[in-house]
Each structure stands twice: as structure tokens, then as C-alpha cells.
Amino acid sequence: MCLQSVIFKLLSSIEAQLHVVHEPEASTSEKDQIGWNETTVVVLSGITNLLANYLDVLSSHTTFGESWKALLAHFKSLLDFKVLDINTAVFKSLRQILSKGNVKGSDTPNFDRSSIDLAWDLWSESLPIVKSDRSDKRFDNQDYLLAYVSALPEIYRLVESDLDDGRVQRMLTLLREAIQQASAAGYTADIEYLTPLQTQVLESIKIIRTDIEGIPAALIGQVAGFTALAFEPRGPPTETQRPTYVALSKASMTLSEKLILDHSSNNNIYMSGAVSASISTLSKPIVLKYSFPTITKGTSPWRQATTSALAILKAILPVITKEELEESVMRSIWSSIVTIANGVTTAFCHHLPETVNIRDDQDFDITSFLTLRELITPALGSQVIPDKTRRAYTESLFHMSLIHQPEPQELPQINQELLATLYQPRKGRTIDPTPSLRSKMSYVCFDELVSLVALHDSSPPRIKLAQAAAPYLILRAGLTLRAYIADQPLRGRMPQPLSQRRELLYILKALVKLRCEPEAIPDTPGIDSEGKKHLHRLYPLLAKAVRAAARDQEVLECVGKALDEVGMEFGL
């Protein structure tokens, strides 16, 4: 057979010459090395075309199995030289030959199980390394890695019927290695568009069948890893050559969304931690928001993450609230959900580029938060969820509800009771703080605190949520009242700044209207109250506010209504 007598002898002679020119102690010039590398690539291309075009004839011969084994052994020997161009040629050859085998409609398969396993072994043994100088800014391994990954769909087509969890895990590991080993040279920054390699990796993942136990979870977990790449800290200066992964991250968010929605009823994706990992990863860009240094022209990563997270939560929350999942799984998922909720309401708006539209982003976040609150309330009050998770949520609502930022000393200090300084007067100020650039969101967060404390159905989850929110609502109202009591007398006949006046009136009206959950706030000694306990706690401040509001009829009227509510509970 000509394979043995001609082709394999030719490959053996080339391998022998490559050993000579790449011997560390050899005095071979770089030009000679490059020449033999190029010769090898040309020979491989010619051999590949011959084998691919005549595969049906060759595979019908009884010795084809041994010849195939020998060919792959030569491929392995060539890979051992760790030469970039040769490695690229080897995997292009493998893909081209495999693409002609076992095609649909063929009467006889070209590759039997043993031959397919040999091809799988060559591809899956490892991602073959190449000799490189990473300090060389011209180094570009994208074509090589693309050739390697492009061989997978053909291998997958042949092994699909015998696919198992182990093989899928190996595929995913090697695909991730290919993504992470890619250099950025030769490509424009992958911010708006995927590189060909990244596209091929995602397309390879999409073809993997998901009807085998454990595979959906494995895919979700791996795609979550791709999402995270853009937000991982960059290494030393030499790593600036690596891709940005921004476009990959956004595409992975969309793929994560689809995978989880398609398999939301699969218990294993929760128990394995895949869902938790996915939503935890989505929380990173949402929390970073404007702090993410890479500017995009298209949809920003935090917006895409928010959209995908909401779609995922809409699908999984009905499942996790009904399924009896392990407490550790539930707690991990809910911790990430709260992180996402807090990230949606938060934004650090200092030193922003001109391309940022704060008002438009705020409207997007408000719509997202209102959607999210409908999904998580009252489920967040479940006894399985730790109190600290609920407190993290309500504490963030408190901080984001602050329209005029107080001085640090006005807030409770570490290891101090939340309401320990509620009644302590502060020094008056004549310099008025600038209102938040996201005041509209601040009012939404305040409204949510009020809603959480309000009486609904007195169910255990509602009580838990009300208890978590009540002290923050009281503190929030107390800060505004204390500021008014301290600052207004210093203004004389000058009116209160419009933004502060609007805030004060809004809060007073909400407090008067609120009928709180009876178990949300501990009873005040000697006072029997049901729905107005929040006003009892604020009574000392309300009484002082009357004196400060002597010249402002509207404020005086609102404070008076609050005091009247307290009086009615005393029978006055």
C-alpha cells in the first residue's frame, strides 16, 4: 500500500530532519529551521488532500486501521516539535480528513470505533504547547488554536453516539485552555466583536448534546467561566497582550441564559452549583457597572448581565421555591440574587466618560429593579435564607435611598446598634449637600423599604422581610428629620433647598400613610400599638420638627398629621 511505502516514509524522513534542525545543540540557522518548518506544512497539506479525496477507497482496504494508527502517530511526533505552524497544519489536516469520513448517506463507515477513539485520543490528550517568546509582540497563536478547536466539531460528530460526561468535561477543559492561551496580537481588541477562535469555541459548545445526566450543568458552569474572564484582574504588564474577553463575556451571558432556561427544571443544575456559579458571575459586571474600565460602543456588559440575570431568575425562582434543594445550595443562590439586586440599585457616578447617559441608565436600572423585586418578594423571607442575606438587601436599599449624603459620623459605626444614635442631635450646617445624581432611584429604594415594612398578610416570610427592613426605614426617616431639625433654624427666613424639602415632605407623607407589620418593630414599653410603631420610634424627632417648621405651613401640617397618628393610638 502506497501509504506505507511512500507517504509514511516521507513523513519519517521529514521528522528526522526536523530533529536535526531543532536539536538544541545544533548550529542550524533560524532560516534553515523556518525552511524545514514550511516544507513540513506543504507536505502535510499535500498528503491531507490526497487522503481526504480518496478516503473511501483507502478505508475499504483491510490495512486501513493500521495505516490510520500510523498516520496519527506521525501527527503526534510532529506535534512534539512544538512548532506553531506545524501544529496548525496537523490539526487542519486532522479536521479535513475526518470531515470526509462517516458522512450521512454513506453505505459503509470509513472509521470504526477504534479509529475514532485514536482521533479522540490525539485531540484530547492535551492542548499541544508551542515554543514561544511571550515578550515578542508579534507572537500570534490564534490561527493555531482556531485550527485545534475547529477539529472538535468533526471529532464530536464521530463520538456523539458514544458521548459521556467524562468526554464532555474533557472537551470543555480544553476549550477553556484554548481561550485562555490565546494571544491578542494580530487582532483588533475583542471588545465589540468575538475573535474567530472565540466564535468557534462557543459554536462548539452549542452542538454538544444535553440529554445526558450532568452535561447541562457542566455546560452552564463552563460558560459561566467564560463570562467571568473579562472581569478577572489582569496580570503583569506582559499580559496586556491577552484579549479583553469583553465580547466573549457578553456572548456567554446570552448563552448562559439559554442553557439555564432550557434546563430550568433539571434538579442537577442547581445541586451541582452550576446555577449558583452562573448568577454569581453575572453579578460581577452588574456590581462593577461604571467601575469597569473598558468602554464599549454597543450594549455595556453590566446591561447585558442585568438582562440575562432577570431572564434567568424569572425561570429558576418558581423552581427553587418549590424544590427541596439543600440549604447550602439555596443560600448560595440567594446570596448571589441579593448581590445582583444591590448592584442594580447602585452606581458610582463620579468621573464618568461623556458617553455615559446617567438618566437613561437610571431608568433602565429602575425598570430592572422593579421587575426583580416582584420576583424575589416575598420569597426572600424564607426561613432557609439567613437573616444576614436579608439584612444585606435592606441595608443596600437604605444606602441607595439616601438622596443627600450624610456625614460619616451621622451613620451607625461598626459594632454599634443600628438606632443607637437616632435621637442624638447633630450640629447644624449651612452648606447644603448636593442631591444624588440618581435621586429617582433613591425614591424607588425608599418606597421599597416602606413596602417591605408595610402590613401585607403577616405570613412568616413577610414578617422576616419586615423585621429586616424596619430599623433601616426608621434610621432613614430619622436622618432626614435630624438634618431638618439641625439645619432649618440656621437658615432664618431662607427657604429649605428644594430637593431637601421635597425629600422631607415625601418621607413624612409615606410615614403617615404606612401601616406597618405589627411584628416588624418591637413594642415600645408601656405603649400598645399595631400599625404605627414606626411613628412611636420617631416621636421625639417629630416633636422637635414642629418647632423647626414654625414658618413652613406645609411641613408643619405633615408633621402634625404624623403626631396626630400617634395621638390617636393614645386615644387623644
Residue ranges, per PLM feature:
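Extended amphipathic alpha-helical scaffold segments
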Residues: 1-572
